[in-house]
UniProtKB/Swiss-Prot annotation:
UniProt KW keywords: DNA damage, DNA repair, Nucleus, Transcription, Transcription regulation
Keyword DNA repair found: yes
Listed name of the protein: General transcription and DNA repair factor IIH subunit TFB5
Compartments (UniProt record): Nucleus
Matches recorded under InterPro entries: TFB5-like_sf, TFIIH_TTDA/Tfb5
Name of encoding gene: TFB5
Disulfide bonds: none
Cited SUPFAM superfamilies: TFB5-like
Highest taxon in the source lineage: Eukaryota
Subunit-level organization: Component of the 7-subunit TFIIH core complex composed of XPB/SSL2, XPD/RAD3, SSL1, TFB1, TFB2, TFB4 and TFB5, which is active in NER. The core complex associates with the 3-subunit CTD-kinase module TFIIK composed of CCL1, KIN28 and TFB3 to form the 10-subunit holoenzyme (holo-TFIIH) active in transcription.
Major place of residence: nucleus
Family: Belongs to the TFB5 family.
Function according to Swiss-Prot or TrEMBL: Component of the general transcription and DNA repair factor IIH (TFIIH) core complex, which is involved in general and transcription-coupled nucleotide excision repair (NER) of damaged DNA and, when complexed to TFIIK, in RNA transcription by RNA polymerase II. In NER, TFIIH acts by opening DNA around the lesion to allow the excision of the damaged oligonucleotide and its replacement by a new DNA fragment. In transcription, TFIIH has an essential role in transcription initiation.
Amino acid sequence: MPKATRGVLIECDPSIKALIVNIDSSQHNIILDELDDTHLMIHPSMVEVVKQKLNKMLAENTYNPNEEAAKATGK
């Protein structure tokens, strides 16, 4: 008999999907199913957690020239 699972469909770029898979690799309770290269089904209660962790990861990997200028001047 088929089993139904409630989830949230996420459509994203393959690079963002890789980040979400990386987040899930440490917890194993986020991704319910990997549908294809750009779609994931994730647990409904984990949507906000994924958003927060993605924002943090993307902020860490974003170049900000103002921060570089502040470091150079010692501020």
